[in-house]
């Protein structure tokens, strides 16, 4: 989040000025209309006495407010704070976003966090104004709206793809959140959504992956192209118009996803501040995997970052200031598969390619050059025991090392450092990309404390400028 205060007076000033930097950081609701909005909503600013503020969309919905049809507050990326924070609340939010509550319930979420369900409920409600069930419900509602308005998928399929347990639950939630039926939402879709409705299950699910602020797509696609492992990934097309495609192993099945590069992916949003999106298309063997697949892409492309906060801090450093000016909104790429990233951080690209050819699972329906899933840790541990690779994959397979979105970063680092032969520099890379830590500096590198808490981003600026090599 930005360094500006977020007390209610400051929040109201952000609403008055339609400041898009606060979109997702908080939401406001108007008691006289029963509607909640993002701070940059272009509608007439309501009177201060009629406004209530909420930390999350789920909290606003839980208080009986409906999403504004003009600014679509549910579509904005949530606060970047929850991806930065390493405490139980941040870990819980990341797990909920990954669909854990939909798959395993609140008890499963609590078990992953090492707390009781009551403790998790209390902590989330205290900080976010909503518990895990409400947060998961808000996410399902948003996913459903996007699918209803931008695809031609049948309503029944959308209900289950969004994570709902029944069509009735889906219909009731849509009415409660949007004051519309699914059919009415589809009829009211924006023009770009209507244009994309030719999509069918066989053609995949087209989605726009929103980001806040400026986004430097080029360096991200450069990295993905440099690292791409044949059979699992490919990058095609000329710079500025490339497409990244890869296979995914998901909780219910498999997927092939494609994300397009958008040159200068910024646009004028509400107010004077830019925002934008990346176009994606997802082919899933089981539509229930949609939420998880989308979250993995968001982590890979670092779409939930707050570039305003990052750039403001780093631009204050004389060495970094010209780099930030040259590449505003530079991201710190993550990964679509944390365990795969850990193995690839240890091996070279040619070795990873060999592992895929020898141990990767062949897709039932290959698509062009995409033919395999990256081998699972248990398969590698059994096939190539001994050495650092064997020790690492065994630790991953036994869950001695956890790299999922809810993993404790310090615990994971300690467990990785305990793997024989795994050096601290490789562990730092895994912590940065697999665990999404924005503040990592490799050992032995003299990095100023003034770059905290965004040292991972600072190093990406140096790498993009050719002043530092990560490996």
Question: Predicted segments — roles?
Answer:
Residues 1-471:
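HhH-family (HhH-GPD) DNA N-glycosylase catalytic core used in base-excision repair
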